[in-house]
Curated annotation (Swiss-Prot):
Record function comment: Plays an essential role in the initiation and regulation of chromosomal replication. ATP-DnaA binds to the origin of replication (oriC) to initiate formation of the DNA replication initiation complex once per cell cycle. Binds the DnaA box (a 9 base pair repeat at the origin) and separates the double-stranded (ds)DNA. Forms a right-handed helical filament on oriC DNA; dsDNA binds to the exterior of the filament while single-stranded (ss)DNA is stabiized in the filament's interior.
Free-text comment about domains: Domain I is involved in oligomerization and binding regulators, domain II is flexibile and of varying length in different bacteria, domain III forms the AAA+ region, while domain IV binds dsDNA.
HAMAP family the record matches: DnaA_bact
Disulphide bridges, residue numbers: none
Protein name, entry field: Chromosomal replication initiator protein DnaA
Residue segments, region Domain I, interacts with DnaA modulators: 1-74
Amino acid sequence: MNPSQILENLKKELSENEYENYLSNLKFNEKQSKADLLVFNAPNELMAKFIQTKYGKKIAHFYEVQSGNKAIINIQAQSAKQSNKSTKIDIAHIKAQSTILNPSFTFESFVVGDSNKYAYGACKAIAHKDKLGKLYNPIFVYGPTGLGKTHLLQAVGNASLEMGKKVIYATSENFINDFTSNLKNGSLDKFHEKYRNCDVLLIDDVQFLGKTDKIQEEFFFIFNEIKNNDGQIIMTSDNPPNMLKGITERLKSRFAHGIIADITPPQLDTKIAIIRKKCEFNDINLSNDIINYIATSLGDNIREIEGIIISLNAYATILGQEITLELAKSVMKDHIKEKKENITIDDILSLVCKEFNIKPSDVKSNKKTQNIVTARRIVIYLARALTALTMPQLANYFEMKDHTAISHNVKKITEMIENDASLKAKIEELKNKILVKSQS
């Protein structure tokens, strides 16, 4: 049996939208395939990883059932050479699909914490339970940039596609450009058909719709049409509806008519979990020291954190060396916020001692009393995260024999953080106090 035919036959097992968005993009690679190995090319690395994980076993099973032969399925990103052979029609198709959902943005890959669990719960509920759509409609998710709003929005889209629903995802910019283009071409009917006749409408950064009254009027009618047809609407924004500038009151009223859920900056434990999830997805192995350093040193923008992880892996691969804490510090030095340059270890020591009611001289001594040892380790941990001091410099500050003693203390406090939720919260609180003080 021709392996390409397997994909065609799989159409019967999947919804039309699911097949068109994912498996229809695969091309059988006959040159690299063997009797027991079937290789398929996906348009990019992201799509390849997603299809391999989600559909690899299904394709293998389907092939075995229909052909009687077993084979390993390998989904890979097509090479640059193969990409260059794309026709103009292919390129036009890619441009037309510029708002396609990111297949890696799923509920399973979203890390849930106190900062986002309400928004996550609401979105997951309506994605899997149609009856809740009438109650939770629209859903309005707001919060600062880079905290996972787009991930959550597209997770709803991907789950809805699997259920065979017609999904439209667009940023406000996409929506405005789409409207403007169709208006110039005299094809507004096409625009209306696209946006009004969908089961799920996902609008990212809805705050930017406030550019013209005409755009808002169009969105108002689309919004009403979808709701009247029992369609689901989910939007994201940087602020809640009542704080949106330039948006008409009637739109604000409709935005606020369903569920309003905020996403706030993640706590330390959630940031650590996010970093681990990103490492797992990108097949990158980082030590606990490095993970904790990234979590405590960077801000809350998840995209920035993922960028650092990928940069670390690139540095290590190109230079042919292991990813160490020192390499992480070197790579991250330009990303760490400038406000941290104002933080000294004396500031950290003073605050920690005040919190634990301990003398600074005791923390800097070699006393082994448990509360003093814990305070000392917290000072070292925060100094590693918030200052540019090296381990030898810290060893000199605490009058320790050498940097290995500092490394030992970092390892111990990291283990304590992982096993003690209250300690995690306390260190996060201390860190925030130090950062706030450095800005004053």
